[in-house]
């Protein structure tokens, strides 16, 4: 991690216009209205917001631009949008609707030049490469998965992340599919591997169960930001108390 302030980022996983949350990418349950959730998170000291239309890529349909626009009208914190972004025109459309960054997953893997073209036009600070990984126990490595975790690629995750950074990604959103929704803590080994090998910020995703897990991701995993969904959506913990736990452990955070 760099010496910058650590960021806490709530994630709105969107399906059919509603916030949903599942375990290991399946068994989805409704977690509320995205526009209301966005406004509440901003009031509660979220540093950024992440909006992922989780079935846009697998359903081959357009991202919910009207919803992006409604959320962008409500909030002033940086706002990342992903899901179903396949072309530079998609990047343009999302940014024009008010997003500050775009998160590209499947399409970036299938066409890495999309990262290059997008970063050349809009700047790498706008381009987040999202990578969903699963641990392969037999070979003790992490494999990249596409289409919301449905498609195995056979490619080693760090190898792809390094290429993505070279192609123009300004940040990596790294999700452990094994930990997703389990609330058992982040995969620290995975985070350490990525943060020590890449020169761009890493957002840790998958496994947050309490503020201590987020502290661990920053201090031990050396992540630059932590992303969480279920622990915030269902009200067990607030972003404010998460940040206070971080501050108590010497992590620089924004508290006003």
From Swiss-Prot:
CDD domains: HisF
Annotated source species: Leptospira interrogans serogroup Icterohaemorrhagiae serovar Lai (strain 56601)
Compartments, record wording: Cytoplasm
The organism's taxonomic lineage, starting at the top: Bacteria, Pseudomonadati, Spirochaetota, Spirochaetia, Leptospirales
Major enzyme class: lyase
A Gene Ontology molecular function term of the record: imidazoleglycerol-phosphate synthase activity
GO biological process: L-histidine biosynthetic process
Primary gene name: hisF
EC number: 4.3.2.10
Catalytic-site annotation from UniProt: 13, 132
GO CC annotations on file: cytoplasm
Recorded metabolic or biological pathway in which this protein acts: Amino-acid biosynthesis; L-histidine biosynthesis; L-histidine from 5-phospho-alpha-D-ribose 1-diphosphate: step 5/9
Record keywords: Amino-acid biosynthesis, Cytoplasm, Histidine biosynthesis, Lyase
Assembly and binders: Heterodimer of HisH and HisF.
Family statement: Belongs to the HisA/HisF family.
Protein name listed in UniProt: Imidazole glycerol phosphate synthase subunit HisF
Function: IGPS catalyzes the conversion of PRFAR and glutamine to IGP, AICAR and glutamate. The HisF subunit catalyzes the cyclization activity that produces IGP and AICAR from PRFAR using the ammonia provided by the HisH subunit.
Catalytic reaction(s) noted: 5-[(5-phospho-1-deoxy-D-ribulos-1-ylimino)methylamino]-1-(5-phospho-beta-D-ribosyl)imidazole-4-carboxamide + L-glutamine = D-erythro-1-(imidazol-4-yl)glycerol 3-phosphate + 5-amino-1-(5-phospho-beta-D-ribosyl)imidazole-4-carboxamide + L-glutamate + H(+)
């Amino acid at each position: 991690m760099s010496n910058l302030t650590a960021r806490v980022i709530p994630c709105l996983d969107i399906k059919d216009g509603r916030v949903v949350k599942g375990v290991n990418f399946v068994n989805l349950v409704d977690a509320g209205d995205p526009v209301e959730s966005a406004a509440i998170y901003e009031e509660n000291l979220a540093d950024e917001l992440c909006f992922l239309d989780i079935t846009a890529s697998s359903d081959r349909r357009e991202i919910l631009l009207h919803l992006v626009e409604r959320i962008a009208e409500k909030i002033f914190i940086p706002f990342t949008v992903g899901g179903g972004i396949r072309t530079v025109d998609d990047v343009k459309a999302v940014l024009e609707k008010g997003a500050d960054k775009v998160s590209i997953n499947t399409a970036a893997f299938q066409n890495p030049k999309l990262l290059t073209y997008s970063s050349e036009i809009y700047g790498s600070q706008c381009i987040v490469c999202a990578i969903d990984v699963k641990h392969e126990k037999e070979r003790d490595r992490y494999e990249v998965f596409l289409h919301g975790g449905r498609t195995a690629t056979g490619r080693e995750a760090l190898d792809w992340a390094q290429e993505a950074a070279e192609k123009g990604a300004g940040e990596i959103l790294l999700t452990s599919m094994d930990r997703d929704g389990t609330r058992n803590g982040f995969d620290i080994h995975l985070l350490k591997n990525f943060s020590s090998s890449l020169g761009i910020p890493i957002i840790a995703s998958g496994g947050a169960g309490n503020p201590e897990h987020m502290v661990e991701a920053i201090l031990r995993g050396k992540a630059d930001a932590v992303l969480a969904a279920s622990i915030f959506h269902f009200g067990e913990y607030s972003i404010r108390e998460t940040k206070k736990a971080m501050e108590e452990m010497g992590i620089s955070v924004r508290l006003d």
